[in-house]
């Protein structure tokens, strides 16, 4: 039996049978249209207004709805790559010193105010709530006032909420002791800034995440001595405003963590990590990993406050366990004073210059 072959017309019909294809036969409208609409002056004017106000007619770069689309993510990331870069070039910023640290570590007056509020909250709830284990010690160590009058101020807080207040009091006591790190970050930024911004060329410019706590302290230190500093803020639900000590033209807001991290690392000459939480740990491990894998320039990575960091993570245990090499322990160092941290940075780069690396 002879094999049937399709005619070219049949192939065309098969390949173009999709809706709206050019090969679809035209449909005949059973209702005759009004052929005089183009002569309706009012209608034409209305259509012209619609053309001029249509999103499709606006310049693509000015179409916010377009830029916010998921498909435009790459364009948005490119903008976040380019905008800070142009600002850094305009201000002749050739290198930066990153300062990371916790948002909850604030200056002493703020920490004392927070502790006072925590004491007051515990005192108001103590009369009607059973004391959880350890609460008595926390209250008495945090407050010199007598607790005999607590009953007269008692609220109707539940045992759970009272326990939470006790926990907040304990945290406030601890955070008060960390005020020294705020002072140290501020002094460190003063030392670095005043040594490196004496002319139009700006080296070792302080750069932070732009928020409160240790970040504020570092920007504030540069501000103290009339020097510039950078703040890379991130747009998050209910998140921070920038601290008031950042140089205005060097304060940026990012949508993407990836682009923010890129600008942290790009010009980094040193990374100094003060005590902090998950965000600080994230930056620490990312920087260590980039150095471990030789994916960023050699920089000193300094952990400020050995006592804190040795409790947070046991690096020696990682080496002893074989999951990192002994050589990886040399990727970072510790510092206890601002002067020591700054000297380590100077020594690191002088040694690299001496070796020609």
Predicted feature residues:
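Short, solvent-exposed amphipathic alpha-helical segments in soluble enzyme
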Residues: 114-117, 223-224, 286-291, 317-320, ...
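Non-catalytic accessory regions outside enzyme or core folds
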Residues: 2-66
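Solvent-exposed alpha-helices and their adjacent loops that cap or buttress functional pockets
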Residues: 89-92, 197-200, 223, 243-246, ...
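Phosphate/pyrophosphate-binding betaalpha-module
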Residues: 205-208, 212-274
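C-terminal functional extensions of proteins
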Residues: 12, 303-357
């Amino acid at each position: 039996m002879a094999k049937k072959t399709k005619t070219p017309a049949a192939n065309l019909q098969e390949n173009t049978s999709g809706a709206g294809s050019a090969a679809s036969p035209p449909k005949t409208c059973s209702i005759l249209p009004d052929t005089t609409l183009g002569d309706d002056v009012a209608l034409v004017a209305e259509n012209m207004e619609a053309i001029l106000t249509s999103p499709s007619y606006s310049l693509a770069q000015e179409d916010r709805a377009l830029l916010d689309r998921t498909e435009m993510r790459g364009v948005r990331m490119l903008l976040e790559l380019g905008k800070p870069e142009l600002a850094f070039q305009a201000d002749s910023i050739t290198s930066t010193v990153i300062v990371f640290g916790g948002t909850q570590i604030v200056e002493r007056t703020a920490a004392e105010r927070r502790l006072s509020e925590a004491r007051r909250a515990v005192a108001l709830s103590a009369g009607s709530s059973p004391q959880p284990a350890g609460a008595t010690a926390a209250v008495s160590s945090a407050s010199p006032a007598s607790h005999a009058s607590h009953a007269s101020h008692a609220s109707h807080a539940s045992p759970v909420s009272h326990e939470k207040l006790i926990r907040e009091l304990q945290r406030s006591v601890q955070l008060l002791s960390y005020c020294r790190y705020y002072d140290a970050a501020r002094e460190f930024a003063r030392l670095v800034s005043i040594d490196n911004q004496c002319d139009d060329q700006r080296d070792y410019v302080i750069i932070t995440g732009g928020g409160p706590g240790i970040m504020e302290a570092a920007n504030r230190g540069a501000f103290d001595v009339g020097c510039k500093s950078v703040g890379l803020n991130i747009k998050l639900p209910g998140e921070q405003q920038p601290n008031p000590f950042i140089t205005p033209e060097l304060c940026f807001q990012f949508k993407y963590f990836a682009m923010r991290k890129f600008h942290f690392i790009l010009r980094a000459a040193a990374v100094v990590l003060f005590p902090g939480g998950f965000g600080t740990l994230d930056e620490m491990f990312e920087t260590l990993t980039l150095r471990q894998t030789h994916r960023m320039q050699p920089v000193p990575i300094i952990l400020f406050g050995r006592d804190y960091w040795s409790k947070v993570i046991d690096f020696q245990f990682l080496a002893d366990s074989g999951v990192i090499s002994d050589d990886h322990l040399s990727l970072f160092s510790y510092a206890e004073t601002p002067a020591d941290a700054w000297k380590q940075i100077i020594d690191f780069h002088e040694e690299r210059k001496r070796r020609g690396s």
